[in-house]
Regions:
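Non-heme di-metal
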Residues: 1-248
Length: 248
C-alpha cells in the first residue's frame, strides 16, 4: 500500500484549517420565543462532548489507517471536545438547565456508549447528524452568547466530521440501521417539543429531515442558510460574551 507524504495528508490539511479559540463565560440574553424547551434539550446533550473524546481515545487504541497525520488529527480533536464541553457549560451556567432534560440526556448518553459500532464511526455519526442540527438550531434560536459559542464549535465540527468520516471510510466501517435508529431516536427526543411552524427554525419536521439527510447523504441543502446566519457583531455583544481567539 502506498503511503501518502505527510505534506499531502488529508488529516494534516484538515487540522491546519482550524481556527484557534478559547471558551469564555457568557451573559444571559433573550431566547427566541417558542424554542426555549428544545434549546434546553439541545444543551443537555453537551454531556456527549466528553464521551466523543472517549470514543476517539478508544479509536486511538485500535488499528488505524496508515495515512500520515491520523493520530495527530484525533488527538487534536480530543482537545477540541474538552473546549466544547467548557464553552457549553458556560452557557448552562448563564441560562440554567432543565433538570428533566438533563436526566433524560443521560439515558441517551448510555445508549450511545453501549452501541457496539466502531467508536470513531459513532463519533462521526453523532457529529454529522446530531451536532450538525443542534448547532444551527442554537444559532437561530439562541441569544448572543449561544450564537457565538455554536458558531465557534461549528467550525471545529466541520473538521471533525471530515476527519472521523475519513477514518471510518479507510477502515471500511459503515453505519447500519441500528445506528440510524439510535440517531433518529436522539433527534426525535431533541425536537419532540416543537410542532409544525411557518418559521422553519421552529419546525419539528424541518429539523428531523435535516438530521436524516445528514445521516444518509452527509449534507443538508436546506441548512445552506446557516452559512449566512446572523453572526454576532462586536457592537451587539458585551466583551464577556465574545470568544477569545488565539492560541488555545
Amino acid at each position: 500500500m502506498t503511503t501518502k507524504a505527510p505534506s499531502l495528508s488529508p488529516y494534516l490539511n484538515m487540522i491546519a484549517k482550524k481556527r484557534p479559540w478559547q471558551a469564555v463565560p457568557v451573559d444571559k440574553g433573550t431566547l427566541v420565543e417558542g424554542g426555549e424547551a428544545t434549546l434546553f434539550r439541545a444543551l443537555a446533550l453537551r454531556h456527549l462532548e466528553l464521551p466523543v473524546r472517549e470514543f476517539l481515545q478508544q479509536g486511538l487504541e485500535k488499528d488505524l489507517p496508515s495515512t500520515p497525520g491520523v493520530v495527530e488529527a484525533l488527538i487534536h480533536n480530543q482537545k477540541d471536545e474538552e473546549r466544547h464541553d467548557e464553552a457549553l457549560n458556560y452557557i448552562a451556567a448563564a441560562h440554567g438547565v432543565d433538570e428533566k432534560a438533563e436526566n433524560e440526556a443521560q439515558n441517551i448518553l448510555k445508549a450511545w456508549l453501549e452501541h457496539p459500532a466502531h467508536p470513531i464511526l459513532k463519533a462521526s455519526i453523532l457529529e454529522r447528524s446530531i451536532f450538525f442540527v443542534i448547532l444551527p438550531y442554537m444559532r437561530f434560536n439562541g441569544d448572543v452568547g449561544i450564537r457565538t459559542v455554536s458558531a465557534d464549535i461549528s467550525r471545529d465540527e466541520i473538521s471533525h466530521v471530515g476527519i472521523h468520516s475519513l477514518v471510518a471510510r479507510e477502515l471500511g466501517e459503515t453505519a447500519g440501521q441500528s445506528l440510524n435508529k439510535l440517531r433518529r431516536a436522539t433527534a426525535l427526543w431533541i425536537f419532540d417539543q416543537l410542532g409544525e411552524s411557518s418559521n422553519k427554525w421552529l419546525n419539528k419536521s424541518f429539523w428531523l429531515r435535516q438530521s436524516a439527510h445528514l445521516f444518509e447523504r452527509g449534507k443538508a441543502e436546506e441548512l445552506a442558510d446557516t452559512q449566512r446566519s446572523r453572526m454576532v457583531a462586536f457592537f451587539e455583544s458585551p466583551n464577556t460574551s465574545l470568544p477569545s481567539y488565539g492560541k488555545a
